[in-house]
Amino acid sequence: MPYLEPYLKKRIDSKLQQLQSLRPLSYASVVKLKEQFRIEMTYNSNAIEGNKLTLKETFLVINEGLTIKGKSLKDHLEAKDHYEALNYLYEFVEKDSLHTVSEVFLRNLQQLVVRETDPDWAGRYRIGDVIITGSDHIPPDANSVPYLMNDLIKWVRNNKRKMHSIELAAIFHHRIVFIHPFFDGNGRTARLAMNLILMQKGYPLVVMLKNDRKRYYDSLVKADRGDYLPFIRFTAQAVERSLNMYLKTLLPESKTKEKYYPLSEISNKTPYSEKYLNLLIRQGKIEAHKEKRNWLTSIEAVERYIKGRMRRRKIPTKT
């Protein structure tokens, strides 16, 4: 049975509660954060699939309508399409925060994701078999796709109150890419659709980073084999990153005292090497977030891990 590790669950639940306690949130701050996340997710989700636009170029294409020299038309169209799909997601949640996941919602999302790059198959399930380049996974026969998608939606509805929303969202994400219901846009659609479940529970938009692409795909492969824990952990850490960014912006300065540093600096001030800190972070045991390719954490986060470890071993702390 997949599960969210207790220490990670406790940390995330606490941060979500902290964010909820700040409501009503500053309108100006939320608008700014949402726009930042829209651009960031559009860039990262497309880049995971091979889009060549940089983060800055993605911003310029969407907000300034610029054409980037040396980048393909497809790269430009994918950025615009994904941004529109994100707008649809936000509007969907804001219009009815309790709306249940449905096949219509998924098909509408995918239709927007590939509207300009694959218009003939936008919003339609595939009718032929497909091979995923670079993957050993062979998606189910095309004839079974409608039945599998119907079963998936029923599964989500049946488990909505039985599972933690992060577990539910992660497994839902995996099942979409496993079934591969569309000819194109499956990964981007799955990353968007997962967010419906999370945003309905009050989480900010969750972005899976291009720099974590290998870990993302490795954990999906393990989920293909029935081991969901790595992908649930990966998803949870992405959730925590979004919560951290919101809290950092919205909390009063006096309540955000922790400063985050690269692991090379933290290792000089704590008992652990940079390599071991990296391992603990990847396991979700120490709170951290990524900036570009580097993990950042705080001395306080390491100290909390040490104290928790001592309590579990029933070793008294110094007074």
Say what each PLM segment does:
Residues 1-184, 188-319:
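FIC/Doc superfamily catalytic core
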